[in-house]
Amino acid sequence: MSMILSASVIRVRDGLPLSASTDYEQSTGMQECRKYFKMLSRKLAQLPDRCTLKTGHYNINFISSLGVSYMMLCTDNYPNVLAFSFLDELQKEFITTYNMMKTNTAVRPYCFIEFDNFIQRTKQRYNNPRSLSTKINLSDMQTEIKLRPPYQISMCELGSANGVTSAFSVDCKGAGKISSAHQRLEPATLSGIVGFILSLLCGALNLIRGFHAIESLLQSDGDDFNYIIAFFLGTAACLYQCYLLVYYTGWRNVKSFLTFGLICLCNMYLYELRNLWQLFFHVTVGAFVTLQIWLRQAQGKAPDYDV
């Protein structure tokens, strides 16, 4: 029989469980799935906002939005469209009931356990398709899942549960590590946003001066072609610093220092065309953005909450 078995609401940044259904079974398979719940909660910050983990006879589905993740366990034959429609209802109700300040400042696990009442009512509706079919329209959800299907989490990415062996576990290098394409950075700070804007400004200034240098060269005013290259390299370096500030990539800190070195070299070559204040501004902004890239690291692992 296809059905929803349990659901949880978890804070993304640290895996703190905010609420959960309390009527789950105590079978061996269910207990193993609860351990997968715990492992997923530690990696939510590194995963896409819509995912599915298949664990044999059960599927774990979740969606994340505004720093909160909504996770559910169902049988493997439960329809995907109903599973994500169920999660969507939980999300809408939770956002309506609790503001972001409450969820961000919560310190105790299950501090919104009263939300379990809504989880239970919604779960009963979705486990009774006859009463459900006339009350919701699934066409939008079907279209959304077709256009943007949930990311399939492999056991390699999840790693092996502590003390748990699974027939679906496989040996692979780097198990438990999420690819950099799905890695998330810590929330941007005000200084990071300022650095991003200043780096864009420096890139724009370099680009404008580069076009002026091309114009001067065409008019045979004697500008060196190497100046044009230096201006455009400076533009590329500033834009790449913006990219590193926003997105996670391998060897990110090393790339940021190399990019800052390129900015310094370009400004050293352009010292005849810029005064000391201009040189100081460009180099200082480059150093500031490099610092912000170094400070804004990938979100770390969550504490070991018993989810």
From Swiss-Prot:
It is a multi-pass membrane protein. Keywords: Acetylation, Coiled coil, Endoplasmic reticulum, ER-Golgi transport, Membrane, Phosphoprotein, Protein transport, Transmembrane, Transmembrane helix, Transport. Residues 209-226, 272-274 are lumenal. Its main location: endoplasmic reticulum. The modification Phosphoserine is found at residues 6, 8. It is found in: Endoplasmic reticulum membrane. The chain crosses the membrane at residues 188-208, 227-247, 254-271, 275-295. SUPFAM superfamilies: SNARE-like. GO terms for biological process: endoplasmic reticulum to Golgi vesicle-mediated transport; protein transport. Residues 2-187, 248-253, 296-307 are cytoplasmic. PROSITE patterns: LONGIN. GO terms for cellular component: endoplasmic reticulum membrane. Belongs to the synaptobrevin family. This is Vesicle-trafficking protein SEC22a. It comes from Macaca fascicularis.
